[in-house]
Amino acid sequence: EYTQYPEIDTVTFNFSEPKEISFTAMGREDPWAVVSKKGDPSSIEYTIPSPTAEELKAHCGGTVTGDKWEAPVSTPTIIKTIKLQSSPYNGKYTEYVFVKASIAGRLSQAPGKEETDLLLVKATIMTPVSAAGVRSAPYCREVKPVTAPVPPSES
């Protein structure tokens, strides 16, 4: 089950490049082997303009009473599955599902005369591991056709 946040602004992907480790023989310039190793953790970042109290709680922790959000006393651990959908283009859209992500949110812009406050969210992508110790893909990407909404049936 996903929570819909229709007002997410631009999303930034920070996919890390693999680090290469070269093995060379003494006196040789070219390596005899190159091994790729995962680099820094990959992450995505997005902003939510004028976040609600519930959106702040979901991304930063804390408590909500009515429309009032109170920041957490200590930094919480927030793990979520994230699904992103692009705007439609040529009858298709792209969907990304990040299976397990560590969420860290913060208010990054104060409200002003002509702008609203912004919630900046960084989601660090993690590899899911089952109870049996089996690792699975951390994310997937799929291009899907745009389908027309089904009108409600009349009785």
Per-segment meaning from a language model:
Residues 1-56, 100-118:
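Solvent-exposed edge beta-strands and adjacent loop segments
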Residues 65-83, 140-155:
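Short, cationic low-complexity segments
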Residues 18, 49-53, 87-89, 101, ...:
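Generic structural motif
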Residues 43-47, 81-83, 120-124:
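Beta-strand secondary-structure signal
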